[in-house]
Amino acid sequence: MSAVRSKICGITRIEDALAAAEAGADAIGLVFYPKSPRAVTVLQARAIIAALPPFITTVGLFVNASRCELNETLDAVALDMLQFHGDETPEECDGYHRPYIKALRVKAGDDIAQACRTYRNARGVLLDTYVEGVPGGTGETFDWALIPDDLDKPVILAGGLTSANVAQAIAQVRPYAVDVSGGVEKSKGIKDREKILAFMSAVHGT
């Protein structure tokens, strides 16, 4: 049975958060990026978090949010971890005294190891597919062979993962965790319970 951890990202409904928890997900992701079809309001986020059972990590995803916007969200929503998906500097990421993940959009020629060193206080790096002008949630995979074997940060693998390819991804990359959004959806922002169950079964090798 795989010990790889998992996050279901882009949660917008209480029932989807509960489905993720019941299927064995370790974390849920809440998107605070207004341009995303999976964005949630503060009120939505609070209701979702209030409905969660214990020991589910809540991750807030931000894209180039201002300090004021982010602090207002943190004052109102009980987030366990931050996920920065934009062009935030290490200093900006460090400025909220919260554990954080830095997303890196991977393409050929990138020095992922150097990026890990740059964001030295990140708890992990989320490796996602590079699509110009799109900060994430593309639904496309990237060449996993581009990921170095000796990164000094836990790797959270994202980008086009589904129940059909996540076992292969885990075997090849050996990530700390996998992150899925579109791969478990009926439509953008609306999760599919059966797809969540199938994805988690593939992650756990059951």
Curated annotation (Swiss-Prot):
SUPFAM superfamilies: Ribulose-phoshate binding barrel (SSF51366). Its EC number is 5.3.1.24. The keyword Hydrolase does not apply. The keyword Amino-acid biosynthesis applies. Disulfide bonds: none annotated. GO terms for molecular function: phosphoribosylanthranilate isomerase activity. InterPro entries: Aldolase_TIM (IPR013785), PRAI_dom (IPR001240), RibuloseP-bd_barrel (IPR011060), TrpF_fam (IPR044643). It is an enzyme of class 5 (isomerase). It holds the Pfam family PRAI. Pathway: Amino-acid biosynthesis; L-tryptophan biosynthesis; L-tryptophan from chorismate: step 3/5. One of its GO terms (biological process) is L-tryptophan biosynthetic process. It catalyses: N-(5-phospho-beta-D-ribosyl)anthranilate = 1-(2-carboxyphenylamino)-1-deoxy-D-ribulose 5-phosphate. Belongs to the TrpF family. This is N-(5'-phosphoribosyl)anthranilate isomerase. It comes from Pseudomonas syringae pv. tomato (strain ATCC BAA-871 / DC3000).
